[in-house]
Regions:
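Glycine- and acidic
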Residues: 21-23, 67
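Alpha-helical phosphate/pyrophosphate-handling elements in metalloenzyme active cores
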Residues: 25-59, 72, 85-90
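Hydrophobic alpha-helical packing residues
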Residues: 12, 16, 41-44, 83, ...
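Divalent metal-dependent catalytic cores for phosphoryl transfer on phosphate-bearing substrates
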Residues: 56-116
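Short alpha-helical hairpin
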Residues: 1-20
Length: 116
């Protein structure tokens, strides 16, 4: 998992941080929040009784850090374009990008409402 997190810090964090800064995203959804969510995801994976594949672990961590990249309250993008652009530039395959998009959409309270 350490290599996955290292890649995310090198390839995803800088453009995501720039995106948030360029759009004056507040502290409630800035890079610190994204990193906190990813860290929570990491510990959930480590504590889970499930044993996830490397690919699923990577995808869950990517989805957790990128979950606000296209939040409609923050951006006017369509079809998760910010997320896709960041991941494409970082060198992720189209297949992985689409899996991460699916994960983000499944957990999005903006798209699915707060069901609790």
């Amino acid at each position: 998992m350490d290599n996955i997190i290292k890649d995310i810090y090198e390839k995803i964090v800088p453009p995501l941080k720039k995106l948030f800064e360029d759009h004056n995203v507040g502290k409630d959804h800035d890079i610190s929040h994204a990193l906190l969510v990813m860290n929570n995801c990491k510990y959930a994976i480590l504590e889970s009784k499930e044993k996830y594949s490397i690919e699923n672990t990577q995808n869950m961590l990517l989805a957790s850090i990128l979950h606000d990249a296209d939040d409609h309250k923050l951006f006017s993008t369509k079809n998760n374009d910010n997320l896709k652009k960041i991941m494409k530039i970082a060198g992720y395959s189209k297949e992985i990008i689409m899996k991460v998009v699916e994960m983000v959409e499944l957990v999005s309270s903006s798209k699915n409402g707060d069901r609790l």
